C-alpha cells in the first residue's frame, strides 16, 4: 500500500480532514522562507489533537541539528524531514530520538551515488525525491520527469524507503504510482486552494486516487 503524506499543514481543520481521509503522515513546515510556515506553538497544538497512527513530520531547511531536536521534542514530531544540502552525515547523526527523511532534488550534476553514500554514512533509510528548483526547497508544484523518477526509485529500493514529491495532485498521482511504484507520495500545493490553505475536496480526491490505483495494482498481481 502506498503511503500518503500531506505536507504544509497550518490549520487544525486541514490536519483533521487529511487524517480522517486516510493520510499516513502530515508535514509541518518550519522553514522561515516557506509560505506554509507554521509556528511551534500552532504545530504543537495541532499535533496533540491528531488521531493515533498519523505521523507528524517536521520540515527543516535552515535549522541546526540542536534546533531540530528541540522542535521535535516540543511539538511532538516523530520524523524530521531534512531539505538542505547542509544536512550531511555529521549533522544528521546529531539528530536524536527522531527518524529522518532526507530530501534529494535531482538537478544538474546529481548522482544516485549521493543517496547511497548518505545512507551508508548515516544509517538513514528514509528518502524523498522532489523536483529541483533553485528558488525553493519544496512545495513548488514542479514535477520530476517520470524516467528520472523511475531510475531513482529502482536504484535505491535496496537501501531504504522513498517518497515521491513534486507537482502531485488528484489528477496525476494515480499515474505516478502506477508508473514509478514509490513507497509513498507527498503533496502540498497539489491539494491547496492557496499556500498553506488546504482544499478538503482535493485532499479527499488525492487519497482516493492513490487507494484506487493501489487496489488495481494489487488485483493485477
UniProtKB/Swiss-Prot annotation:
Pfam families: PRAI. Pathway: Amino-acid biosynthesis; L-tryptophan biosynthesis; L-tryptophan from chorismate: step 3/5. It catalyses: N-(5-phospho-beta-D-ribosyl)anthranilate = 1-(2-carboxyphenylamino)-1-deoxy-D-ribulose 5-phosphate. Gene3D superfamilies: Aldolase class I. InterPro entries: Aldolase_TIM, PRAI_dom, RibuloseP-bd_barrel, TrpF_fam. HAMAP family: PRAI. This is N-(5'-phosphoribosyl)anthranilate isomerase. It comes from Chlorobaculum parvum (strain DSM 263 / NCIMB 8327) (Chlorobium vibrioforme subsp. thiosulfatophilum).
Amino acid at each position: 500500500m502506498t503511503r500518503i503524506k500531506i505536507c504544509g499543514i497550518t490549520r487544525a481543520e486541514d490536519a483533521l480532514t487529511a487524517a480522517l481521509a486516510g493520510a499516513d503522515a502530515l508535514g509541518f513546515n518550519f522553514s522561515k522562507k516557506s509560505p506554509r510556515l507554521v509556528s511551534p506553538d500552532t504545530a504543537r497544538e495541532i499535533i496533540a489533537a491528531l488521531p493515533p497512527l498519523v505521523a507528524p513530520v517536521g520540515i527543516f531547511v535552515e535549522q541546526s541539528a540542536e534546533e531540530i531536536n528541540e522542535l521535535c521534542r516540543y511539538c511532538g514530531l516523530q520524523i524530521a524531514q531534512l531539505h538542505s544540502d547542509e544536512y550531511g552525515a555529521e549533522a544528521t547523526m546529531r539528530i536524536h530520538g527522531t527518524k529522518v527523511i532526507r530530501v534529494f532534488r535531482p538537478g544538474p550534476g546529481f548522482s544516485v551515488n549521493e543517496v547511497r553514500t548518505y545512507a551508508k554514512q548515516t544509517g538513514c533509510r528514509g528518502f524523498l525525491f522532489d523536483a529541483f528548483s533553485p528558488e525553493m526547497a519544496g512545495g513548488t508544484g514542479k514535477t520530476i520527469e517520470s524516467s528520472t523518477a523511475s531510475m531513482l526509485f529502482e536504484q535505491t529500493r535496496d537501501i531504504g524507503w522513498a517518497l515521491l514529491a513534486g507537482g502531485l495532485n488528484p489528477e496525476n498521482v494515480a499515474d505516478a504510482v502506477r508508473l514509478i511504484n514509490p513507497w509513498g507520495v507527498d503533496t502540498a500545493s497539489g491539494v491547496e486552494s492557496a499556500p498553506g490553505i488546504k482544499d478538503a475536496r482535493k485532499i479527499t480526491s488525492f487519497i482516493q486516487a492513490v487507494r484506487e490505483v493501489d487496489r488495481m495494482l494489487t488485483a493485477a498481481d
